[in-house]
Regions:
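N-terminal secretory signal peptides and thylakoid transit peptides that target proteins
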Residues: 1-14
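Gly/Ser-rich catalytic/binding loops embedded in alpha/beta enzyme cores
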Residues: 16-19, 33-224, 242, 335, ...
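C-terminal segment of classical bacterial N-terminal signal peptides
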Residues: 20-25
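A short helix-breaking turn/cap at a secondary-structure junction
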Residues: 28-29, 34, 240-333, 351-354
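Acyltransferase
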Residues: 66-67, 98, 298, 322-350, ...
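Charged, often glycine-rich, active-site loop that binds/positions anionic groups
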Residues: 133, 176, 180-183, 356-371
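Structural signature of FAD isoalloxazine-binding scaffolds in flavoprotein oxidoreductases
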Residues: 228-233
């Protein structure tokens, strides 16, 4: 299904789902008729820069933008196609936006993320009214005493925290046969492109919400593929930062050597903006000391239109066989990269891995029609 057509058709028939946690003040319950649409703001594919321009001109405010995203969440996450990507909404989101609008009126703009709504994965501590559960019923009632270090950095940058996204429970570290995007607390998250398929995990909620334009930007976490896989499946830009570039303090852990949070956005520029905002040395996470002198607060300076020129890009050979439509799309993308100056190299990675005796990777595809 064409992404833009799907997003425009957010009124597909579905059964209403009550949000977990409190709905932000001034809003009726999901599915109710008590709230009129607050703005005609078109959120489809909108970027951080475009939102900032609207706030700077006075055409929009952080409050109006936040309300527009909340309306969209009501329409297609909690009703309509019911993506079920958001496990909990932040009841303080509008008041946070109000405070940031006041700062702007008083001449203070913290940076490119000032007043920008964000969703973060439910294994990242937020020291507020929301829970941090990794999607598990075992942790229902758990409220963190303070923000995770990276969440503090993002708040300092001026984001409006809309809520938490669903995930594969315990970030998929619970079973060798678990289904991506399912948690006992949040249920099953759907792919916004194919509603009877999961959006890949474990940052499934951030992937689905980002693709459906339910927030300007999202944060996921990765041990092994949990940012880049849902980003790839949902046509997003996902970055797994070098471990230590973003602090891991306050994030429910799996691996001391592989874990990190990372950006999930719809454009490379937005990913670069979010990446810089999350960096910082954290005395509680010694590995962040390795980023001293190597990190920056602005990665957008490295974005170049001719950035692919002279680069060699490997393409796994097995992806060039099978479904003809997918192969056609991949080859078209390869052609675009070649016209931008890249050299495409077909490589065989999977065969040597099989020879090493790696276990078969199992993919769980949810089929809502058959249960």
């Amino acid at each position: 299904m064409d992404r833009r057509k799907f997003l425009r058709n957010g009124s597909l028939t579905g059964i209403g789902l009550t949000a977990i946690g409190s709905w932000p003040r001034a809003y009726g319950a999901p599915g109710s008729n008590s709230t009129k649409k607050t703005t005609a703001l078109n959120l489809e594919e909108i970027t951080i820069q475009a939102l900032q321009s609207k706030m700077q001109s006075g055409e929009e405010s952080s409050v109006s933008i936040t309300k527009a995203y909340l309306e969209r969440i009501k329409e297609i996450d909690k009703a309509g196609p019911m993506l079920n990507s958001i496990i909990e909404l932040n009841p303080e989101s509008i008041s946070i936006a109000e405070g940031l609008d006041l700062e702007r009126r008083n001449g203070k703009v913290r940076g490119p993320l000032h007043g920008i709504p964000i969703l973060v994965k439910d294994n990242i501590n937020t020291g507020d009214q929301m829970l941090t559960t990794a999607g598990s019923l075992a942790l229902v009632g758990n409220r963190a005493k303070e923000d995770a270090f990276v969440m503090k950095r993002l708040r300092d940058a001026g984001v409006v925290l809309l809520g938490k996204t669903n995930l594969s429970e315990w970030a998929n570290f619970r079973s060798s046969h678990s289904c991506s995007g399912w948690s006992s607390r949040g249920g099953q998250t759907k792919s916004p492109y194919i509603l009877d398929r999961n959006p890949s995990g474990s940052s499934a909620g951030s992937g689905s919400a980002g693709a459906a334009n339910l927030s300007a930007i999202c944060v996921g976490t990765e041990t092994d593929g949990s940012v880049v896989s849902p980003a790839s499946v949902n046509a997003l830009v996902g970055i797994k930062p070098t471990v230590g570039l973003w602090s891991r303090t306050g994030i429910i852990p799996i691996s001391a050597t592989q874990d990190t949070a990372g950006p999930m956005t719809r454009s490379v520029q937005d990913a670069a903006i979010l990446l810089g905002a999350g960096t910082g040395v954290d005395e509680s996470d010694p590995v962040t000391n390795e980023s001293i002198g190597k990190s920056t607060k602005d990665y957008t300076v490295y974005l170049k239109k001719d950035g692919l020129k002279g680069k060699r890009i490997g393409i796994e050979k097995s992806h060039l066989t099978g479904n003809p439509d997918l192969v056609s799309l991949l080859r078209a993308a390869m052609t675009v990269m070649e016209t931008q100056g890249a050299t495409i190299v077909e490589v065989d990675v999977l065969t040597p891995l099989k020879l090493l005796g790696t276990p078969n990777i199992r993919f769980c595809y949810m089929n809502l029609k058959t249960g």
